[in-house]
């Protein structure tokens, strides 16, 4: 068994929370392990002047950390799973999916105003095409503004009065103790989350069997089923672009329920569908369900929507 582990992580407050959480959990199970953190500045942390959708790189927040992992300068990488591309680099693997936090999105607004009660032409901040598409389908009048930076920076920009509201993932808001700022938690019926939202993905080298065995204690089986279904769906649809796709899976007693959304950026077109599969006994079956639902969405017209988006990316 290894005596030392080096965890690679971004240096943002949320990324550090995630890495420290992982360190604490591993230390609880393996108290003799010497665990340290290596902070890595990623492309996504540096390129803050452009919207994520315009940069177009699928590994903005992960690939720079993965370089250290491939070079054996770190033993594992801790990511927000929603930031991890569905195809990992050769030689790397997601070895653990941590138990998921609440997957929903939240609205932060002035005076606690709920989303549908925001004034006409309200300025709503988000960096996500997925959120933009679903927001515009509900409120075409919204003036969507791009916002970048870590969570603390976003709250600072909001407090300076640049926006009427902003949309964030509940998980990050909760983990960094901003829950008292939440104006509304949006149900999945109107806002499907990003694939993998709320979970952490712990990435290792495929051939590092000792580390893979160690991080298995962090794996949450239900989360693995759900996230593999969602990631399989996204992989089948994506084609290398930042596109407005939302998905949420639940899994209990062998039954998987998977919801998905594909929409145009301006919110004028949107397709939702769902699938339920019973008797599942392996994550591979959950992945197959993701592909099946992706095919249904394509038949419903998702291909037309995605083709239009790919012309601009």
Curated annotation (Swiss-Prot):
One of its GO terms (molecular function) is hydroxymethylbilane synthase activity. It is an enzyme of class 2 (transferase). The gene is hemC. Tetrapolymerization of the monopyrrole PBG into the hydroxymethylbilane pre-uroporphyrinogen in several discrete steps. It catalyses: 4 porphobilinogen + H2O = hydroxymethylbilane + 4 NH4(+). PROSITE patterns: PORPHOBILINOGEN_DEAM (PS00533). Its EC number is 2.5.1.61. GO terms for cellular component: cytoplasm. Pathway: Porphyrin-containing compound metabolism; protoporphyrin-IX biosynthesis; coproporphyrinogen-III from 5-aminolevulinate: step 2/4; Porphyrin-containing compound metabolism; chlorophyll biosynthesis. Binds 1 dipyrromethane group covalently. This is Porphobilinogen deaminase. The porphobilinogen subunits are added to the dipyrromethane group. It comes from the Bacteria. The modification S-(dipyrrolylmethanemethyl)cysteine is found at residue 241. Its cofactor is dipyrromethane. Monomer.
